């Protein structure tokens, strides 16, 4: 089980949450105890009543709704205490079967009847279209002056001069957090200390711990011309840290893509294995809900994939274009960087992001990004890697 799935399991399959919902369902059940057939979902001729109770009351007590996103699209979700997870008919079936079976005496019987005799209770078309709509809800997002980090034990609100922590239940009315964006660790306020820029920029090579910090600084080392020793370049680290911070803060102020390339690029050569993907892909995937895209899908050779954003979901916070090829067509991203973002999914479906709400973007490349002029320059924050 992945860490993200582990959080979903512990959060939504919580025994107290299920027990509370089951008590409400027992107070007005959608099933009856038939004198001949035993426990059944509905009596003869009373299907409409049972359907209404099941879809309108039972499923909503378990937190299942159709959430409206971007004012035009509905997505099936489960809600609990300010956290939402995107679901499908299989998840709903598994959760309902698990929860109902916990009801003493009749739970197993009613699940058996629903599964064998009345399988339409779990039919994809019926269950997803019958979920009740949930309107006027929006996810927590960063603003110009505030950033949020979501941990298993609550929400961290970060301003320039303060850090506050509160539970998911204390979110503002009408706001929620996607479960995919919850970091799989608890927040420890005792680890927070006042930021010291001089200490942050200083070479950490001789200090213990801070492994990722030192990894990033190692990318900013180059050999001196005199004795060929590795020398730390503080200005390059500033550029890398600035780009990294821009990606972590999800407010779109400057519409740019962070690009990490080798410093000494030579035409016709590919200088890989220097750690660029570790920084822009592996590192950020542990801090943001990330989708990695093979950057070779976007090239001037006409290799165009209409479903390049297939795996992007409403909860996605960052898109990594990994290992851009020598003819990476950066122009394809122009409108996606400065405007809205439309993501087409295979087998139907589309997700649209407003220009302020779309995921941040970064790319790593062993080659120069082709293109000249302000349209290219204004959309790029370039960080060079000098470890070769």
Where are the regions a protein language model picked out?
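AAA+/SF3 P-loop NTPase mechanochemical coupling elements
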Residues: 308-314, 345-364
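P-loop NTPase catalytic core of nucleic-acid-dependent motor ATPases
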Residues: 63-91, 157-315, 381-383
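Walker B catalytic acidic pair
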Residues: 321-324
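Alpha-helical scaffold elements adjacent to nucleotide-binding pockets in ATP/GTP-utilizing enzyme cores
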Residues: 95, 279-283, 332-336, 363, ...
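Conserved catalytic/switch belt of AAA+ P-loop NTPases
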Residues: 329-353
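Short, polar loop motifs at secondary-structure junctions
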Residues: 365-369
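A short helix-turn-beta junction within AAA+ P-loop NTPase domains corresponding to the substrate/partner-engaging
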Residues: 372-387
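Intein modules and their embedded homing endonuclease domains
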Residues: 2-178, 356
